[in-house]
Design a protein with these regions (language model features):
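Active-site proximal beta-strand in glycosyltransferases
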Residues: 76-78, 94-113, 134
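N-terminal strand-loop element at the rim of the active site
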Residues: 10-71, 140
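Acidic anion/phosphate-binding donor-loop and adjacent secondary structure
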Residues: 116, 142-146, 159-177
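Conserved donor-binding/catalytic core segment of Leloir-type glycosyltransferases
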Residues: 181-197
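Nucleotide-sugar donor phosphate/pyrophosphate-binding loop at the beta->alpha transition
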Residues: 102, 109-129, 138, 142, ...
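Short amphipathic alpha-helix
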Residues: 1-12
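Short N-terminal targeting/anchoring amphipathic segment
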Residues: 50-57, 64-87, 102-106
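Short hydrophobic "strand-cap" motifs at the C-terminus of beta-strands
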Residues: 136, 156-159, 189-193
């Protein structure tokens, strides 16, 4: 998610004045299964200057974030949406922009693959605060239409990150790099991948 956000920011920044606002905390530690929810110096991430304001579980930060973004006076606010847990915070910010500011969401998911009883109501709350959306797949576009019929939307398939992950490598070169025998079938293990992926 962060790689695509950085790429979008870079591209839009070529022709527009852009500013990134960020989470100071996305998830409470007990809900976050990974090692860290922050970019570390070891990450090969595109550096993005951003202002960390929003705490997903801190309503006071929602008010401060909305105020700070509104003071910046954007014509368009682009919000990334991927999990309903963040809908209260993101929906609050979306609702508190000026009338002239269009609020557009980029959706990885409208309804998560691992569903909970609260997903649809929270997503509907978020959707009612935005002007339109970009979905990264047709299936997510269908979910958006189901929860918010007629909401302006377009589908732009999720891009490949050539700049972030490098160019395609020839098989022999990869086998040499990994110390594998040439021409053999190799099993690549990418960790535990949920069934829906």
């Amino acid at each position: 998610i962060s790689q695509l956000n950085a790429a979008i920011l870079q591209e839009l920044g070529k022709e527009h004045t852009v500013k990134a606002f960020n989470f100071k905390r996305q998830y409470p530690e007990f809900l976050f299964p990974g090692k860290t929810q922050y970019v570390t110096p070891d990450d090969e991430a595109v550096p993005v200057e951003s202002e960390a304001l929003l705490d997903s579980i801190g309503p006071v930060s929602w008010i401060k974030s909305a105020r700070k973004i509104k003071e910046w006076n954007p014509d368009v606010l682009i919000i990334r949406y991927w999990v309903s847990y963040l809908a209260p915070a993101l929906g609050f910010v979306a609702r508190h922009m000026s009338k002239k500011c269009k609020v557009i969401a980029i959706f990885d998911n409208v309804i998560p693959h691992e569903r909970h009883f609260f997903d649809k109501p929270l997503s509907k709350y978020f959707l009612s605060g935005i002007d339109g959306g970009v979905t990264l797949s047709p299936e997510v576009g269908q979910d958006l239409e189901e929860l918010s019929p007629g909401k302006p939307k377009t589908v732009i398939p999720h891009p490949i990150y050539c700049d972030h992950f490098g160019t395609k490598m020839e098989r022999k070169e990869a086998e040499n790099l990994l110390g594998l025998e040439h021409g053999k079938k190799n099993l690549l293990f990418f960790g535990l991948i949920p069934e829906y992926k």
